[in-house]
């Protein structure tokens, strides 16, 4: 339970006691954690069929059993190849304008001069980006229907349900599990209706769902409806909460560090009145700022895998069915890698390219987050859009603290700030 409540503190205490690599004894067997970059390289460089996702029994009921995050081996390779194109290159950049549009719409509703938790707005921006980019939903009535159904589903997934499987019982239609099942049934119905309508009308479109439906495996077959549904649920769950939370942490830092805020605003202002998404994405200090946000408060404290067959890690042999985790939160706060690691300093990235074995906010290797490039792209455009028109001051003297929020870690108070127009 200590890990579930505050994994940053829990893992940090273990490293201070045992060093960069240590083993936890859990009810599921040995759980090996490493924050040694040389060993991280070994984990990420291992053949893809060395591992499978861990713990699948925790995530499966919420993401769908055929989710890319849960698949392994040949199925993972095939699905990842099919799903990759919309999240990279020109396909991804085509969504820049709609990210800015969604951000402007929500910024216009933010109370000015009053204490406001900013995380809900950031997650609303992220959700609207998903609705537009993934589902092609722009109409206000349809947007509200989708938004309500998705939020009901997301809010029904509580940390208790995730970490205490014994709670996953219907109890005659009452209780948290019954609420989750009911919300998921409504979301499933909406997703299947959309998938089948697209297939029936041969209306694929240029949104991510359309690209998935039109994509084909090497043998010419398409992804089945149930598999498409599980990928869409994963995109919503993984994309909505995570990017919105990183944006909220971004505002927290901007509200507390005037020099950082001013430097970022100066860079964004210099791009002109209507900068292109490409110009925003190429801004160097903005890139460094986003890297630093994800270093200090990574959304996931570690990247864990189950060992499929015995695996050699350094001088140790990890048995099958044990787990291996890359300690992201430990790597990111290692003073040997990042001097003064608890200081928020975007400039540390201006002359340093992130090492994939020292900086792992999106995991690494063959299972690196499929949407990593899209998430960074969205962060940059949303932040540039926001800082052009608003400034923030903190509502509390003490900064927000990381706390468990469903699967991920986020600010305990939603980041309380006061917004003012520039």
What is the meaning of each model-derived region?
Residues 2-19, 193, 275-314, 335:
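Conserved cytochrome P450 K-helix E-x-x-R motif and the immediately C-terminal K′/meander segment
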Residues 48, 310, 326-353:
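Conserved cytochrome P450 K-helix/beta-meander segment immediately N-terminal to the heme-binding cysteine loop
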Residues 52-60, 75, 91-245, 263, ...:
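Cytochrome P450 heme-thiolate monooxygenase catalytic core
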Residues 242-255, 382:
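Short, small-residue alpha-helix embedded
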